[in-house]
Amino acid sequence: MFCVPSTETGAIMNITKGGLVLFSANSNSSCMELSKRIAERLGVEMGKVQVYQEPNRETRVQIQESVRGKDVFIIQTVSKDVNTTIMELLIMVYACKTSCAKSIIGVIPYFPYSKQCKMRKRGSIVSKLLASMMCKAGLTHLITMDLHQKEIQGFFNIPVDNLRASPFLLQYIQEEIPDYRNAVIVAKSPASAKRAQSFAERLRLGIAVIHGEAQDAESDMVDGRHSPPTAKNVAAIHRSLEIPMLIPKEKPPITVVGDVGGRIAIIVDDIIDDVDSFLAAAETLKERGAYKIFVMATHGLLSSDAPRLIEESAIDEVVVTNTIPHEIQKLQCPKIKTVDISMILSEAIRRIHNGESMSYLFRNIGLDD
């Protein structure tokens, strides 16, 4: 099982406080809860900064204490207005850079635009663009959690620590699901099978994979550079020179590979945003005989009508971490539960500031985790 720092809740960590400044880059007060938890664990005060919107909707950041020669940690959690969130971060990073901070470490538990990390049709790899902007602004190190694709780390030319929330979710399963030994870990599509396998192997449980219409359709659009030529061009091409094209994909009827009858089904994924695929998976699992259904994910974006749809669905409980604030969604849907991951973020900050190795936080993590 993954290793988690043994710091007890509320305990103050052993940290060299001199030369450390902790900022929250959020102008939205509801997004500052995670920052406060981290500061409390580290036993430090939040740095003095003012982040607000001008009447013309421009973002303004005013650093209200000296950061010269200090390690500055900027915590930024993503709000509904993701573009404002990004501008707040970039402006604060640049302000610290021009104020001669020794190092500027971004603590971004959920990396925005991480779903746009592949070329689709005539679009762009937006997460690469965002990584370049952060580095150009002055970021010297990034702490994040469960990137949507691990390859995003390669978009940066600075150190990136991609922490894992799995230890906390595994602990929740063991402590909060009394009969979890009768559970099966479910991947709602073949794309998430590796993550499900990682959970199943650590809990010594079986695995099931849902395949068919419920799987994500975005995999069909990975690269659109195969666009067919125009009709005029086709007429000009000799038949013998036509380039063979891939046969279009046709999804089979939805099916479950693995036995879930009379079991608890635990669906695992990294992000839960649009919940349609999770609802379809839950209905399928119910039809196959699962008597209880849990959904576990690191990042709970829970956009649009997600809380209402979850409340009305066959899902019994949705468990997410607090990488993204979702207090309003919890009020709308009591099925949503939160796991606090401030402990591991605090430990990462402490180790980086004290110049200690980060390898402890990655023990027992394999290439597929």
Curated annotation (Swiss-Prot):
SUPFAM superfamilies the record matches: PRTase-like
Domain of life: Eukaryota
Alphabetized UniProt keyword annotations: Nucleotide biosynthesis
Pfam families xref list: Pribosyl_synth, Pribosyltran_N
Gene3D superfamilies (alphabetical): 3.40.50.2020
Any one GO CC term of the record: cytoplasm
Example GO molecular function: magnesium ion binding
Ranges that cross the membrane: none
UniProt-listed GO biological process terms: 5-phosphoribose 1-diphosphate biosynthetic process; purine nucleotide biosynthetic process
Family to which the UniProt record says this protein belongs: Belongs to the ribose-phosphate pyrophosphokinase family.
Function noted in UniProt: Seems to play a negative regulatory role in 5-phosphoribose 1-diphosphate synthesis.
UniProt name for this protein: Phosphoribosyl pyrophosphate synthase-associated protein 2
Native source species: Gallus gallus (Chicken)
